[in-house]
Amino acid sequence: MALWRSSDNTVYLPPPSVAKVVNTDDYVTRTGIYYYAGSSRLLTVGHPYFKVPVNGGRKQEIPKVSAYQYRVFRVSLPDPNKFGLPDPSLYNPDTQRLVWACIGVEIGRGQPLGVGVSGHPLYNRLDDTENSHFSSAVSTQDSRDNVSVDYKQTQLCIIGCVPAMGEHWAKGKACKSTQQGDCPPLELVNTAIEDGDMIDTGYGAMDFRTLQETKSEVPLDICQSVCKYPDYLQMSADVYGDSMFFCLRKEQLFARHFWNRGGMVGDTIPSELYIKGTDIRERPGTHVYSPSPSGSMVSSDSQLFNKPYWLHKAQGHNNGICWHNQLFITVVDTTRSTNFTLSACTETAIPAVYSPTKFKEYTRHVEEYDLQFIFQLCTITLTADVMAYIHTMNPAILDNWNIGVTPPPSASLVDTYRYLQSAAIACQKDAPTPEKKDPYDDLKFWNVDLKEKFSTELDQFPLGRKFLLQVGARRRPTIGPRKRPASAKSSSSASKHKRKRVSK
């Protein structure tokens, strides 16, 4: 007897449809007009480890300037819709808008290569666990020492039209009450990378201020700071691709020394992991190990800077379009981390015999940058689909173009008084128009204004000449020897001579 039964195979339904994100090349039309823009020489000087107040804080303090900080340049571009164009008929302002596309960039770095060191005069170092002769028990005395290290070597460049995102581990909120001295819970935090934020130096991307209360586990410049690491996973998965058009990075690190930490051990070693010893080895020492990082040798053979880069295809959907007429350049370069040592005599005349009490020692760090760009002028036709897509992506773009979206009509009844100036009714003053707020007003960047530094004479600038060489454009000569036109007399005689030869 035949018996019918339903199939045991699992039926997979198609996933629900999602809104498709299109590439900027699908609605942005590129023109053949290119501009060069470059900054001036950008310099900064400060103390490499901490801020220094001057005269008890009455004057502006000496800033903290370290090679292990992020340099985030916010580059402001002119509005192309208000720009003096070489061809006024290039676009129709009634149906089109102009935008900039970044197609070339060169980040120049001055100063020689060098290795900088950082350290802590009271560094929490207990034993040398690499060449240890005996296992010491838990130390009850202050074993901190003056230690310096050379950090991890990093070169980094991230370019986008919004700030780059960073990640670090911070102190989280525990689900239940904990006792004083318990290990705090960890939480991964994502924040924008600002100018002056510390990079990962080899000790991890974490909030050292809240997670290391001894203030001696890491060197001075990061013991009360937050070290951030770029969140490449999130920026690569950015829906619109604004945070990272492309990135360049090189990292190098090895462990130079191996130590353990002083203090009471929070997590006891399980007894099944070792066999108890005798005498001084009856109780094992601390197992909280920590290496000292080192970035090793720096070389000009592995430099990312002082060379041009051309953007043909971005890694995301934004192929170099500078929304809101701005760019964010995030830079790290630890290969030029030399810290200057300065000395000043405390007396008017320099003594003939050296005495350390008559001299003051100082340390400073300097940085030098130069930014150059090649921009391409592009047009966007304001069709209904394009405007709806841009409004979904970022409504502020349409507001900056003076294009408003009409709100739907209100279904509720609106009260309208007749005598607006009458004292018998409440004040009918119109609400003030809210000012446009900068979305990055609370963030810190190094502002670079290029609104008056655009030029179409590409052959007059180093990066412009490199770009012309790439595209194969030949420059038309403006001066120099030219072929002299033949005189009328010689032309007439030549014609007669030619006719004479033909008559034969």
From Swiss-Prot:
Record's keyword annotation contains Transferase: no
Pfam families per UniProt: Late_protein_L1 (PF00500)
Record's keyword terms, sorted: Capsid protein, Disulfide bond, Host nucleus, Host-virus interaction, Late protein, T=7 icosahedral capsid protein, Viral attachment to host cell, Viral penetration into host cytoplasm, Virion, Virus endocytosis by host, Virus entry into host cell
Region: Disordered, residue numbers: 474-504
Single GO MF descriptor: structural molecule activity
Subcellular location: Virion; Host nucleus
Annotated Basic residues bias: 474-486, 495-504
GO aspect biological process, one term: endocytosis involved in viral entry into host cell
Signal peptide location: none
GO cellular component: host cell nucleus; T=7 icosahedral viral capsid
Record has Magnesium as a keyword: no
Family: Belongs to the papillomaviridae L1 protein family.
Stated role: Forms an icosahedral capsid with a T=7 symmetry and a 50 nm diameter. The capsid is composed of 72 pentamers linked to each other by disulfide bonds and associated with L2 proteins. Binds to heparan sulfate proteoglycans on cell surface of basal layer keratinocytes to provide initial virion attachment. This binding mediates a conformational change in the virus capsid that facilitates efficient infection. The virion enters the host cell via endocytosis. During virus trafficking, L1 protein dissociates from the viral DNA and the genomic DNA is released to the host nucleus.
Subunit structure, as described in the record: Self-assembles into homopentamers. The capsid has an icosahedral symmetry and consists of 72 capsomers, with each capsomer being a pentamer of L1. Interacts with the minor capsid protein L2; this interaction is necessary for viral genome encapsidation. Interacts with protein E2; this interaction enhances E2-dependent replication and transcription activation.
Protein name as annotated: Major capsid protein L1
Gene: L1
